[in-house]
């Protein structure tokens, strides 16, 4: 929980409100006694906190009786499916997408559009994104939801704690502040304060989605220490240590795509040579597989289309494509081996485009990890990382953005519900 308000009575109350809301959001529906037990407060101490969250519309009574008797209506508590919603947006090289997620974690609205954003001026891109944002906010308003914040996923370096894209090579952007271009989308028409805006690297938001939504469908839940790899045109990574993103001094940690795999390899747009993206990026794999990237993009527009083409060709036994994917897995394994040796994660999670190509990438990737990491010195490999494929796939960054936008409500319910509910201090 974010530290709020110091140790004053007001600050303690705000922290406890957050603890109650977060506990019910993560584990509910729960009875009041169960909430008290989980956060270590007395029932009498929890009661006014619950009442305040009920008045604010952040919690609701389910009407389901608690165990051990008939109970009373609303005896169990759940987070509301109305009220605040997190708005997530994604700016991709070939698409734009927006979604809204409620406190229960359900996607309540989603729109996407093909968009040729590569080397496009930021202004028109943000104008199109603003139109999609207006569409989503209008849709959720009809369901009793209001935006609590906006988070935007971008494929590039983002200044830590700022809204400026420092460099996004695959978009062709440098030093672009998204706040002015999205001002119309973040300023509510009723004159209330502008929505909080977060801009974040897409791989970091993919990792956040993995923390919140990963596992399930027969997969183990992600550990608290893992490396999340996300790829489409470019390749990014996010490092999670003890459940928190490792951002680096400037917020640039995780630029896996520009780790040199073969120092004398082909030139990269970043100015280096032999970068991972030159072997495992989408365009590199298309080229190595005998599919001209430009023609493939024209014939198969839209997010995921070229990845689908590669997967189909590989499944049909196209030798050149299978070989290209094998090379991509080898290069990815070499790059990840350094990260694994340095960080000792419990898992490596493949997301984005890599998830759809995993059957052909994993064998060579895992071989390189076994050869090049300290795991090879452990005969039982008991402590080594496992490599898993995210079930979220290419949806991870967008979902992570929406959940990031909603986090402010969970961290500080008192402030977040202030426009609709102004409790006494």
Regions found by a protein language model. Name each.
Residues 89, 146-153, 157-284, 400, ...:
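Phosphate-binding/catalytic loop of phosphoryl-transfer enzymes
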Residues 115-116, 252:
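A short, sequence-level motif marking secondary-structure junctions
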Residues 1-74, 78-112, 118-146, 187, ...:
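ATP-binding/phosphotransfer module of carbohydrate and carboxylate kinases, centering on a glycine-rich
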């Amino acid at each position: 929980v974010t530290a709020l308000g110091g140790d004053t009575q007001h600050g303690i109350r705000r922290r406890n409100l957050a603890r109650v809301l977060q506990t019910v959001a993560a584990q509910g529906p729960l009875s009041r006694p169960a909430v008290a037990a989980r956060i270590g407060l007395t029932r009498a101490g929890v009661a006014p906190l619950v009442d305040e969250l009920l008045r604010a519309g952040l919690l609701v009574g389910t009407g389901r009786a608690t165990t051990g008797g008939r109970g009373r209506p609303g005896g169990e508590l759940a987070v509301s499916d109305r009220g605040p919603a997190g708005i997530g947006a994604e700016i991709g090289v070939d698409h734009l997408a927006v979604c809204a997620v409620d406190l229960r974690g359900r996607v309540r609205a989603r729109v996407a559009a093909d968009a040729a954003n590569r080397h496009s001026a930021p202004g028109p891109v943000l104008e199109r994104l603003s139109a999609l944002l207006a569409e989503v906010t209008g849709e959720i308003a009809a369901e009793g939801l209001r935006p609590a914040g906006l988070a935007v996923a971008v494929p590039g370096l983002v200044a830590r704690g700022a809204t400026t894209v420092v460099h996004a090579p695959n978009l062709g952007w440098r030093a672009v502040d998204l706040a002015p271009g999205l001002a119309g989308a973040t300023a509510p028409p009723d004159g209330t304060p502008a929505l909080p805006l977060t801009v974040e690297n897409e791989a970091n938001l993919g990792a956040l989605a993995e923390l919140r939504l990963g596992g399930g469908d027969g997969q183990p839940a992600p550990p608290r220490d893992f490396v999340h790899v996300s790829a489409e045109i470019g390749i990014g990574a996010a490092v999670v240590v003890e459940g928190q993103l490792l951002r680096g001094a400037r917020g640039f940690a995780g630029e896996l795509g520009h780790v040199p795999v073969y120092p004398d390899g082909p030139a990269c747009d970043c100015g280096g040579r032999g970068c991972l993206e030159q072997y495992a990026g989408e365009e590199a794999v298309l080229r190595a597989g005998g599919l001209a990237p430009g023609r493939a993009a024209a014939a198969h527009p839209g997010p995921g289309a070229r990845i689908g083409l590669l997967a189909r060709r590989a499944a049909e036994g196209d030798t050149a494509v299978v070989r290209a994917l094998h090379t991509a897995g080898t290069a990815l394994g070499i790059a990840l081996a350094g990260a694994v040796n340095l960080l000792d994660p419990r898992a490596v999670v493949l997301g984005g485009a890599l998830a759809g190509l995993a059957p052909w990438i994993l064998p060579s990737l895992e071989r390189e990890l076994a050869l090049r990491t300290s795991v090879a010195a452990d005969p039982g490999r008991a402590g080594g990382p496992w490599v898993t494929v995210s079930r979220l796939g290419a949806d991870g960054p967008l979902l992570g953005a929406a959940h990031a936008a909603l986090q402010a409500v969970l961290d500080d319910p008192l402030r977040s519900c202030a426009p609709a509910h102004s409790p006494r201090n």
